[in-house]
Amino acid sequence: MAEGNKAVDLTSLSLEQLSEVIKQLDSELEYLSTSYGQLGRAQLKFRECLANVNDAVRAENDGKEVLVPLTSSLYVPGKLNLGNSKLLVDIGTGYYVEKSAGEATEYYKRKCEYLASSIENLNNAIDAKSVQIRAVQNIMQQKATATTAATKSS
């Protein structure tokens, strides 16, 4: 059975145990920081998609020749037809849905807002983890100072 997180009195731990706690917290902080970067890149991708939708549906772009990506390195020539006003929207893992320009804009706005919220939550978790690391480091410093003082007085 999995047990929930238990509160541990850090002052009761040895310096070696505190060092292990810091290693664990550093590992968690690194994971959170990596996730933060990935979410930021995803949000940037959706913002670019939103800007591309807004650019594509401008009246002056009707009939404009464009390159349509088939893969990351293969493009074919195409022509914008605003009379159709349907766009293929990448919804992830290689799936596309046909949407109107307004629906595509709303989709990408929602994605950006969701990612902004997730990034904010992750940033709060990173801040909390940093505070925990500093608290453990302070206790380690106090214990090291106390150990040094006890050794000198002996």
From Swiss-Prot:
Any GO BP: RNA polymerase I assembly
Subcellular location: Cytoplasm
Domain of life from the UniProt record: Eukaryota
Single GO MF descriptor: unfolded protein binding
InterPro entries given in the database record: PFD_alpha_archaea, Prefoldin, Prefoldin_subunit_alpha
CDD domains given in the database record: Prefoldin_5 (cd23157)
Pfam families hit by this protein: Prefoldin (PF02996)
A cellular component term, taken from the record's GO annotations: cell division site
Keywords for this protein: Chaperone, Cytoplasm
UniProt-listed NCBIfam families: prefoldin subunit alpha (TIGR00293)
Quaternary structure annotation from Swiss-Prot or TrEMBL: Heterohexamer of two PFD-alpha type and four PFD-beta type subunits. Interacts with byr1.
Family that this chain belongs to: Belongs to the prefoldin subunit alpha family.
Functional summary from the UniProt entry: Binds specifically to cytosolic chaperonin (c-CPN) and transfers target proteins to it. Binds to nascent polypeptide chain and promotes folding in an environment in which there are many competing pathways for nonnative proteins. Required for normal cytoskeletal function and when bound to byr1, is involved in the regulation of sexual differentiation.
Name of the featured protein: Probable prefoldin subunit 5
Gene label: bob1
